[in-house]
A protein has these predicted regions:
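N-terminal Lys/Arg-enriched interaction segments
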Residues: 1-186
């Protein structure tokens, strides 16, 4: 029988692809529902709250995982079991994300949107592994990885004194759109 109630976020896949984002989503939703304590050691949550948390967590598991953890009745035990099974992913995701960040270059992307998307994918992976890239690091990464033929352009953007990464990206997007319009007219 299929689940008729709507999922608040994507269920945890048995293949472990979405574990890190699933953990974050589960923690946020449990906290919003007042059930965040149910997945913390030595919690004082009521039996009813633990049951609600367990229902919520099981509802957001792949069918195969539900079967595998069928006998687990406590939300904390389920949380610890899943953590033990999947938490090692940080050891594989973190080095790959660091490598991608180190080798990320603005010049390698055709559009600002494409570059920006990759920046946020990498920084999100790093953040999920408890490693944060600051806005000034994102600014510097972007400005220092312009193509060598665009050094004057890089200096012009640097002279604008952007304090936020989003401001730089907005400016780059606007300039890219203007450039596209000029190219269409010629």
């Amino acid at each position: 029988m299929s689940n008729l109630s709507k999922l608040e976020f994507v269920a945890l896949d048995i293949s472990r692809k979405n574990y890190l984002s699933w953990v974050l989503d589960a923690e946020i939703h449990l906290t919003a529902k007042g059930l965040g304590d149910c997945i913390i050691d030595e919690n004082k949550a009521s039996i009813q709250d633990k049951a609600k948390a367990m229902i919520f967590l099981r509802h957001h598991l792949d069918e195969s995982l539900k079967v595998e953890y069928l006998t687990v009745k406590d939300s904390l035990d389920l949380w610890i079991g899943l953590k033990g099974r999947y938490d090692h992913l940080k050891a594989t995701v973190l080095p790959r994300a660091r490598y991608e960040w180190m080798h990320l270059r603005f010049q390698d992307y055709k559009t600002v949107i494409e570059y920006n998307s990759v920046v946020f994918r990498i920084t999100s992976q790093l953040k999920l592994c408890e490693e944060t890239i600051k806005a000034e690091d994102m600014l510097e990464k972007t400005l220092t990885t312009f193509h060598a033929s665009n050094m004057i352009l890089q200096q012009q953007y640097r002279e604008k004194g952007f304090q936020k990464y989003s401001e730089l990206i907005s400016c780059l997007l606007m300039d890219e759109q203007h450039n596209d319009l000029l190219n269409e007219k010629s």
